[in-house]
Amino acid sequence: MQLVKYSASGNDFVIYHTFVKKDRSELAKLLCHRHEGIGADGLIVLLPHSRYDFEWQFYNADGSEAEMCGNGSRAAAHYAYSYGLASKQMRFLTLAGVIEASVEADVVESQLTKPKILDRKIEENGKRWWLIDTGVPHLVTFVEDLNQFDKNESKRLRNKYNANVNYGIIRDLENVGVRTYERGVEDETLACGTGMAATFLRAFEEGVVNPTVTVVPKSGEELQLRYENEKLFFKGRVKKVFETFKEGIW
């Protein structure tokens, strides 16, 4: 089987397509292992679908299946277009719902499923948090310095609320910074698309940023996010890192 490694805003993924739908939790752990496998934040498997260009299975590095991954959706869209599974404009099915994406060279824009505010009144460690679903649940707080990111606090909150944890900083009306602790990876990652989206959405709701902003994660790779007609879009570059072949995968 041909496997392709992609990077999107600092998140990396192993992607392939097949006709067989089955549980691939153990395969995800094997392929995503940083020392004994290819190494990635997640495994994406594309499958044919009767109504959409394709559907996907997305697995975190620990083998857990996730409803959605923002940067993963952009990598998957680029893969699908590059390997003839979809045109430049596509729709595909995730556990969170239908995702729309468009590809132009190495830049991909995805429209996320409709976001939901789950809780506005969380107080933890002297900080106010919001729980927001942008395909997967995210806790969001704002700080004056991203060095205030606390991995131990993030791990505790991730387990308490079963959510990803995001620290955001508002630099000005058009620029936001984010650091994210991701469940499934169980560590801080270089980027998280749905986390960046949740942080932007909360800032926009507060009226402290414009409807179109640049968001910068730990990787330093910029993403453009916009909120338009109650729809959330995000756009950025993706990179095909390499292709490889592995026997016994289907």
UniProtKB/Swiss-Prot annotation:
Keywords: Amino-acid biosynthesis, Cytoplasm, Isomerase, Lysine biosynthesis
EC number: 5.1.1.7
GO molecular function: diaminopimelate epimerase activity
Pathway(s) served: Amino-acid biosynthesis; L-lysine biosynthesis via DAP pathway; DL-2,6-diaminopimelate from LL-2,6-diaminopimelate: step 1/1
Entries under PROSITE patterns matching the protein: DAP_EPIMERASE (PS01326)
Binding site for substrate: 11, 60, 70-71, 164, 182-183, 193-194
Pfam families in the record: DAP_epimerase (PF01678)
Root EC class: isomerase
An annotated GO BP: lysine biosynthetic process via diaminopimelate
Site label Could be important to modulate the pK values of the two catalytic cysteine residues, positions: 138, 182
Cellular component per GO, a single term: cytosol
InterPro entries noted in UniProt: DAP_epimerase_AS (IPR018510), DAP_epimerase_DapF (IPR001653)
Chain's role: Catalyzes the stereoinversion of LL-2,6-diaminopimelate (L,L-DAP) to meso-diaminopimelate (meso-DAP), a precursor of L-lysine and an essential component of the bacterial peptidoglycan.
Protein name per the record: Diaminopimelate epimerase
